[in-house]
Every structure is written in C-alpha cells, then in structure tokens.
C-alpha cells in the first residue's frame, strides 16, 4: 500500500498527516509505532487521520494517534495543523471548519493573518468525567507520589490533564515526576502532565509530559488546561499567553464558556511511503 502524507508541526509538536478522504488507509497500532520512530520511520509525536464527516452537518472527522500507536481523544496543536492541511490541500474552501473527534465537536477558524483559532469546547472539571478518582470537584487536589505530596489542578480538554504549579520551569522534574503522574492510579486512563510557571497574570511558561509520548515542544490541550487551572487558582487572567518550548499560544477562557486557543500551524513537506 502506497500512502501519501504530509509532515506538519504546531510550535514543534510534529505530525504525520494522512488524507483519508481521497485515500483508503488503515494502519495498525504496530505500524503507527514504527512510522513514529525518528530513526527508522517518518518520526512524529502524533499521527492525524483526516476522514469524511460522520455527521452531515460537519465538514470532517479526524482521528489522533500517539507515537506508541494508541488512539487519543483530542490534540490542540494537531487541530490547528488539521485546519491548515484541509485548506492547503483544497479539501475545503471554508475559513470556519466544523469537525468531530473521538471526544466531540470542535470549531476551527483560519484567521486572516494565517493563525488558526480553535474552539476547544468547555473544559470538563467534574472528576468522574475527566476521568479522575476524587470525592468531589476541587480547584486543587493533593496526590501522593511515592514519598512526595503533589498539589495539582485536574481538567479535561477532551483529554485528561494534570497541572502542577512550579517556581522554576527550567528545573521542573518533568522527566521524573511526569511519568509517575501519567501512570498514577487515580487517573484510570492515564493523564497528560503540565508543569506551569506563572510569570504574570497575562503570561505563563509551560512544559508538558504527554501521555504515551513523553515531553514535547508544545501541547495545545495542555496550554488550554494550564489557562483554565491558572484562572481557577486566581493566577491568570481570562486572556493570557502560554509560552511553551516551541513557541507561544494565545488563550481565552471564562468560566462556563469554551476555551479558545490561537496559534500557528506549519507545513514541512509532502511525502509517500510504501507499507
């Protein structure tokens, strides 16, 4: 099987993007994992699969697979790349694109400056729906990790996130605490872990340990989760900039509303591979 694909990235969070509207591609979990290998494959953080809409009122459906081959519910940086891809490839002429994912519906808007705004939907704070094991909804939760106590915020942006505030992002224990929290027993579906340093009420720095991937240069849903948790803990304003290793995202959220994220999406190259 010969597969046409594109390589794209959002702030360094990189993707293999496959048009499954004009192709008929099925990839096993093992095949995706092999393609994700940066030495022996294409190399990517996630694979995005664009498909025809399941709902006639929507424009597309898209699926997201991590580098380990597992399918996940949502990806903010991937959503921006999705929007640029379908416009660039002539799959749509619309500037406002409505799509479905495994977790629900999102709206993408291609701005006149080329940036893309994603309406990520309302954040989920109810523990059982994240899912997260807790007696009741709190702004801050206490987790026991080995011999340590960790304070964190927990939210779902279509996928689960745990956000830990730190004083110094450059020395945050991302590679040690990240995988421990990812696999913590109170997160039955595992969790993405964000380490957040507040610089001001309008600006914060973030590093993310992504579930099934490891640390990435950027995580769109992680930035959304950080903006929500930062505001719930009275650290951030509704409009704020989240700075990730790969670049900046602009966020807007008010309680009871959808989270809106604006940022870039970059095309790298087109290719084909024989499977």
Curated annotation (Swiss-Prot):
The record marks 161, 210 as: Could be important to modulate the pK values of the two catalytic cysteine residues. One of its GO terms (biological process) is lysine biosynthetic process via diaminopimelate. One of its GO terms (cellular component) is cytosol. The active site is at 75 (proton donor), 219 (proton acceptor). It is found in: Cytoplasm. Substrate binds at residues 13, 46, 66, 76-77, 159, 192, 210-211, 220-221. Its EC number is 5.1.1.7. GO terms for molecular function: diaminopimelate epimerase activity. Pathway: Amino-acid biosynthesis; L-lysine biosynthesis via DAP pathway; DL-2,6-diaminopimelate from LL-2,6-diaminopimelate: step 1/1. InterPro entries: DAP_epimerase_AS, DAP_epimerase_DapF. Its main location: cytoplasm. Keywords: Amino-acid biosynthesis, Cytoplasm, Isomerase, Lysine biosynthesis. Pfam families: DAP_epimerase. Catalyzes the stereoinversion of LL-2,6-diaminopimelate (L,L-DAP) to meso-diaminopimelate (meso-DAP), a precursor of L-lysine and an essential component of the bacterial peptidoglycan. Belongs to the diaminopimelate epimerase family. This is Diaminopimelate epimerase. It comes from Psychromonas ingrahamii (strain DSM 17664 / CCUG 51855 / 37). The gene is dapF.
